[in-house]
Amino acid sequence: MRPSDRTPAQSRPVTITRQFTAHAEGSVLVEFGDTKVLCTASFEEGVPRFLKGKGQGWVTAEYGMLPRSTHSRMNREAARGKQSGRTQEIQRLIGRSLRAAVDMKALGENTIVIDCDVIQADGGTRTAAITGACVALVDSLNWARGKGILKTNPLKFLIAAVSVGIYKGEPICDLEYIEDSEAETDMNVVMTETGKMIEIQGTAEGEPFSHEELLSLLELAKHGIREIVDIQKAALS
């Protein structure tokens, strides 16, 4: 039995609120249950030095958690003077995932900077961030097309992400914090809207998992992401 009484395949309620802030070209508040992440997409002219003159764009991401997004306050990383390894890992994951969804040639020599700030954390912050950032990215691309900066749509497909894991011996989808902290296996999966894999991050926290359990987890993720993509499409319609 899960703490929330959800079935093993059941995700938390997902809500996507677009145009959540006034200034960014794309901004989204994404909620996976009690996990809430603000995702903005800023469209900027120019590209990093290593891409200058190559006729293609770039998508990059930053990720952070507000000090009281967790049960007890944590210091801002800026106050500590450096980012944690976890933060660097997550923002690279977000950037990689979103770059898979964009035709960089069609983007031209422009950069989209994604900022994901966790307002409240209850597990699955990175998967919520990817899901919300994708919608913010779409809005920023539509803004650029509306301004005549882009002639064609660089978006190849929507992407979304969900966590899966083995909790008390049972594969489950979309882990909240209490499940994540006690899971024998924890996995984050990023997929396209058609069910193709972009990234799989999986770790046996306790007992090693079998090939059959891996396939079961991926099937749960595919089902969960399909539902999340439907919510993205409804938000964008």
UniProtKB/Swiss-Prot annotation:
Coiled coil: none
GO MF: 3'-5'-RNA exonuclease activity; tRNA binding; tRNA nucleotidyltransferase activity
EC number: 2.7.7.56
HAMAP family in UniProt: RNase_PH
Similarity annotation: Belongs to the RNase PH family.
Recorded name of the encoding gene: rph
Catalytic activity: tRNA(n+1) + phosphate = tRNA(n) + a ribonucleoside 5'-diphosphate
NCBIfam families: RNasePH
Keywords from the UniProt entry: Nucleotidyltransferase, RNA-binding, rRNA processing, Transferase, tRNA processing, tRNA-binding
Record-given protein name: Ribonuclease PH
A Pfam family per the record: RNase_PH
Binding site for phosphate: R86, G124, T125, R126
Subunit structure: Homohexameric ring arranged as a trimer of dimers.
Role summary: Phosphorolytic 3'-5' exoribonuclease that plays an important role in tRNA 3'-end maturation. Removes nucleotide residues following the 3'-CCA terminus of tRNAs; can also add nucleotides to the ends of RNA molecules by using nucleoside diphosphates as substrates, but this may not be physiologically important. Probably plays a role in initiation of 16S rRNA degradation (leading to ribosome degradation) during starvation.
GO BP terms in the entry: rRNA catabolic process; rRNA processing; tRNA processing
UniProt xrefs under PANTHER family: EXOSOME COMPLEX COMPONENT, EXOSOME COMPLEX COMPONENT RRP41
